[in-house]
Structure formats: structure tokens, C-alpha cells
UniProtKB/Swiss-Prot annotation:
Molecular function terms from GO: histidinol-phosphate transaminase activity; pyridoxal phosphate binding
Gene of this entry: hisC
CDD domains: AAT_like
Organism, as annotated: Buchnera aphidicola subsp. Cinara cedri (strain Cc)
Enzyme class (EC, first level): transferase
Gene Ontology BP annotations: L-histidine biosynthetic process
Protein name, entry field: Histidinol-phosphate aminotransferase
Taxon lineage: Bacteria, Pseudomonadati, Pseudomonadota, Gammaproteobacteria, Enterobacterales
Amino acid sequence: MKRLIPKHISILKPYQSARRIGIQGRIYLNANESPWINNIQYKFNNLNRYPEFQPYKLLKKYSLYSGVPINQILITRGADEGIEIITRTFCESNIDKIMFFPPTYDMYNVIANIFNIKKIIIPILSNFQLDIKNIKKKINNVKIIYICYPNNPTGNFFSRNKIIRIINSVSKTTLIVIDEAYIDFSIKYSFVSELNNFDNLIILRTLSKSFGLSAIRCGFVLSNVKIIKILKKVLAPYPISIPVSDIAIQSLCSQNIFLMQKNILRILKNKKFLIDQLKKISYIKNIFHSEANFILIKFAESKTIFKYLISKGIIVRDQSHNLGLKNCLRISIGTIHECQELINVLSIYKGKI
């Protein structure tokens, strides 16, 4: 069997998603999902036919929502497939390099490892901003730069001006990919308005977070017409199933967009409530500012708290293994009941810190 497996695959460490880790509990605050069940109803009687390669009705709906023309949109199976197809399309194995800035979303690293792509890794600064000085030193001959915006797991935006400086400083053969998985929580900061200004700019979007549709795996790549045409060459022949496209189309009708925006306001309200209450807990050392539907918290001793929360049936995401995030846990913003339960459990903690 060893002879069958390429060396870079045999040593590969897969992405540890919340579901893959598989810890069981009663309150899940570990995957940055919407805490509310989507009310979309669906019935199918057309499952005997293959779906459209790129469902036109869905393209039209997302075009209206995003303000991006239809021919500048590619529908993918979540933003993760967007990362995968961009890397696979534009990078040659063991030749090309990508760049990213940890601690950040780990799929940039995992997909580079899958396709045996070289990596230039520039850690962010202690203030969670981009290290422009070191980026400029190592930016030559990089094929793709991935920027998570707002960043996961830190929750903050990188300086827009610094990102523009990076785009202006690279050659036309370097692609800048802005991962906007969480942008709906602060939509006014989107880079969509810059698409027509830069030929090498790509934006990733998803319906998993603000739209509450994590289960259907539906994302979008936004770029110029030429890049979208190239990506279509590599995309699977039937990437979006009929049930997925039908549900996504419904989610993008005006009524459901209004509900999504209402849920965002609920999340922001719950986040403020949660932060205000957590500030009263003495063993919490820092609550980092977040523009997303989660917060990053530094504890006096995170491993103890992580295990304690599991014992109480509350599942959060351990980030203490990530560079610069010692004793940090990432907590998704849940319902007001879930937030209050988390506060109650943390408030009565009597263990050793």
C-alpha cells in the first residue's frame, strides 16, 4: 500500500472540522454556524435529470444580491471548493508557491499540502495585522495570496489600505484571493467594489454562515470574466445538485434575505451581550474584537476550561495550538439562551486556574 501513496499524501494531516473531531454535547458553539434552523421548504420531483453546470436562476439571484455580473460568478460546493479549484487551476505541483498569514483558516494550508504546492507562511503581528514588511520581502514569484477577511479565528479585519498596497505591489501573475466567508456580518467592508479595479483579484463567498445553510455546501467565486472562464475548465461537470440550487435560490429571495439580515442583527446583539457578561469573569484575560459571528477569548488556562465546558455539554473550538493563540478558545455566537447558558457555566467554575 505504501508504494501506491505519494509521499506528500502519506504525511498529510487532514483538516480537523468540528464534525470530524466529533465531540458530542448539548450546545454547539464550535463551527460558526447559524444557531437558527432555516425555514425553507422544498420538494423535488426532478431528480432523474442531471443538474445545470451552473444553475442560471441561482447565478441571477446571487448577482442581484452581490452586485456582481452573472459572468463574473462561479458557483461551488462551499467556499472550500473555491479554494481547492483556484489552487488546482493556477498552481503546478512542487513548482508554484502560495502565501497565507496564520493564524488563519487552515484549508489554505491543507489544500496546498494535498496538491504538493510550496508555501510561504508569514505570521500576522501581535496586533493581528498583516506583517507588510516581511510580506514584501517574500512576495516575489508567489502564485496565490490567500487573505481571510475578516480573519478566522481572530475575527478582525486586516487593514484595507495594507491589502490594497499588497495588490498594487504584486505582479499581474500573482492572484489575490480575499476569503469573505464572514463578510455578511460587516458587509460594507467587502472588496466587491474593487473587482473591476484589479485583474488579479478573486473573492470567495458562502451561504454557510449568515444564510444558515451550512448543510447544503454552496459557495461562490467572484472575479473577472477571464478568470471565471478558466476556472470553469477545471470544475466538475455537475458541481451543484438540484436540491442545493433550489434551496439556495429560495434563500436569495427578498423575503429570506430580509430574514438573514434580521438574524445578523440578532447575532450582533447576542455578541455584545455575551462580551459584556464575559468581561465580568476574572480568569478571562482578553476578549478580542470581532467583526464576525464568533469571538476569540484568551483564558488564564484554556485547556482546563475547554475540558470543563465539554463536561457541561458545551462545545467550543480550541485554538491554543495555533501560532500566537496560546490559551485561546474560539466561541461561536449562539442564541441568547445558549449565550446565557455559557455565561452561567463559566461563572460557576471553581477549578484551579
